[in-house]
């Protein structure tokens, strides 16, 4: 319709930038009814029109993107397709942290571009019949349209960061107060008591850091107790990480490794522990990378029958799966996963004596932290306030029941779409997360990015997922509803069909 190209009999044209374009498309059933093309590789189309944008645009930027080729089939132009297409395009731009957008705007839509926030920076270019306005949008400047898009409701299937309840959010706005005050000491004691009840452990200790710190502090205890020889179990990414961490602590570890998402052979484990000279066993309870809830009851029974110390990374199971850790020696978790508070507080539950560590960095000394009532150093009061409030949700089993209910509902919906869910032994299927193994002809990166521009956020970018073409849906987020699950399944169906 804009006569910038010569006519041809096929009425088809391959864009000269096609191989580097990112396309945002609008579909109705199986029909593509609208599209937008983006490119973040220079030279842009506008570079060629101006013989280099930077000769005329004098502002600064670090990560530019060009928007081109807006096209909507005629019968859909008076529908919401344009608005929705613009929204998805800017969702992509915002989510990927671009700081400026360039366009060659058609003169007939200058008013619309200005409404969105674009500004002219050069005189018109092109021909009399196909005239364009070089324009830019500074994505770091105040913009009501972009602000509204940034505040749009999001559907969260990520395993973190998690949704926060309103009362937890309120605690984050409180005035900070001293970690040495009586108020903070009382708050911390109360928080520790709640954690000990939920985990069913003798002692809880809180450190200022991520869940990795909790595991590191446990490893420091093992080393300090002279428990140098260990067996680390791994059947996923986080078990593999434990192997690397224990070695960094100069612990002598063997790795009982099985395939990604496979179950441990309990008879073989028993044999390994009987024949080996092991002081401790370390494993992940809920292996998030695959969605397997390792049979901790059976493993604990075997390990303790040998008189061996047992340490558990329960970062993604605590708060999501009701479980008593009474029979393990150490358990690591954090504030930022299924407890549904803000990340930043590492938690260690223990059912054994914590030993002082004279030759270990003080930050890793659980004995010292515990002796100081989990206030060995500065602790941010708002993080403790938020966690303390979040823990009140575990006075009943409702949180666990909701997670399982949403998991079951989504699982049935994915089955209806014939999407292959990773096969896990029935007894060890985790209700925390569903792992979908996409067919080779469907890109996990494209599916994840397409859901993201629709404000649906899933777990798909981690390298261990990308290399296996896997996507994941987590159910620890408190605000996700069954209606949102239905919406997500509907979007998936429109994107990839019934497979």
Q: Model-found features: residue ranges?
A:
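Conserved acyl-donor/pantetheine-binding loop and adjacent beta-alpha core of acyl/acetyltransferases
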Residues: 17-19, 31-77, 131-132
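Conserved GNAT acetyl-CoA-binding A-motif
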Residues: 93-105
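Conserved beta-loop-alpha segment that forms the PLP phosphate-binding cup at the N-terminus of a helix
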Residues: 201-231, 235, 239-243
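A glycine-/small-polar-enriched, mobile loop at the entrance of the PLP active site in fold-type I
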Residues: 153-208, 212
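Active-site C-terminal subdomain of aminotransferase-like
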Residues: 163-164, 336-412
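Conserved C-terminal alpha-helix-loop-beta "cap" of PLP-dependent enzymes
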Residues: 415, 420-483, 487
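Active-site phosphate-binding strand-loop segment of PLP-dependent enzymes
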Residues: 264-315, 319
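Conserved acetyl-CoA-binding loop-helix of GNAT-fold acetyltransferases
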Residues: 77-91
């Amino acid at each position: 319709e804009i006569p910038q190209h010569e006519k041809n009999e096929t009425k088809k044209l391959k864009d000269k930038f096609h191989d580097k374009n990112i396309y945002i498309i609008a579909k109705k059933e199986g029909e593509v009814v609208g599209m937008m093309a983006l490119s973040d590789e220079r030279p842009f189309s506008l570079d060629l029109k101006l013989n280099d944008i930077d000769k005329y645009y004098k502002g600064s930027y670090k990560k530019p993107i060009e928007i081109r080729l807006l096209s909507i089939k005629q019968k859909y132009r008076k529908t919401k397709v344009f608005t929705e297409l613009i929204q998805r395009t800017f969702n992509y731009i915002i989510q990927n942290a671009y700081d400026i957008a360039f366009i060659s705007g058609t003169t007939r839509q200058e008013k619309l571009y200005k409404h969105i926030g674009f500004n002219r920076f050069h005189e018109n270019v092109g021909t009399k019949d196909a005239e364009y306005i070089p324009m830019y949008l500074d994505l770091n400047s105040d913009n009501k349209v972009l602000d509204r898009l940034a505040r749009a409701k999001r559907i969260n299937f990520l395993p973190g960061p998690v949704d926060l309840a309103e009362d937890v959010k309120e605690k984050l706005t409180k005035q900070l107060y001293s970690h040495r005050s009586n108020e903070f000491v009382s708050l911390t004691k109360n928080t520790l008591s709640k954690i000990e009840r939920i985990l069913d452990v003798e002692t809880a200790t809180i450190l200022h850091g991520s869940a990795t710190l909790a595991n590191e502090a446990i490893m420091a205890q093992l080393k300090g107790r002279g428990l140098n020889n260990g067996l680390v179990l791994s059947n996923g990414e986080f078990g593999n990480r434990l192997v690397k961490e224990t070695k960094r602590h100069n612990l002598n570890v063997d790795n009982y490794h099985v395939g990604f998402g496979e179950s441990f052979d309990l008879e073989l484990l028993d044999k390994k522990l009987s024949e080996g000279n092991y002081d401790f066993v370390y494993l992940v309870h809920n292996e998030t990378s695959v969605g397997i809830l390792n049979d901790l009851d059976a493993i604990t029974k075997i390990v303790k029958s040998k008189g061996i110390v047992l340490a558990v990374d329960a970062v993604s199971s605590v708060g999501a799966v009701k479980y008593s850790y009474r029979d393990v020696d150490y358990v690591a978790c954090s504030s930022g996963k299924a407890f549904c508070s803000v990340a930043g507080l590492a938690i260690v539950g223990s059912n054994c004596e914590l030993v002082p560590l004279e030759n270990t960095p003080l930050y890793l000394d659980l004995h010292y932290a515990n002796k100081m009532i989990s206030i060995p150093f500065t602790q941010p009061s708002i993080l403790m306030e938020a966690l303390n409030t979040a823990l009140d949700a575990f006075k009943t089993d409702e949180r666990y029941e909701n997670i399982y209910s949403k998991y079951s509902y989504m699982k049935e919906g994915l089955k209806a779409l014939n999407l292959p869910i990773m096969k896990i032994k029935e007894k060890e299927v985790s209700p925390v997360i569903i792992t979908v193994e996409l067919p080779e002809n469907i890109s996990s990166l494209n599916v994840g990015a397409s859901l993201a521009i629709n404000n649906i956020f899933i777990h798909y970018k981690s390298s261990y997922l990308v290399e296996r073409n896997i996507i994941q849906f987590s159910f620890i987020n408190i605000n996700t509803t069954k209606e949102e699950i239905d919406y997500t399944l509907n979007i998936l169906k429109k994107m990839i069909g019934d497979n």
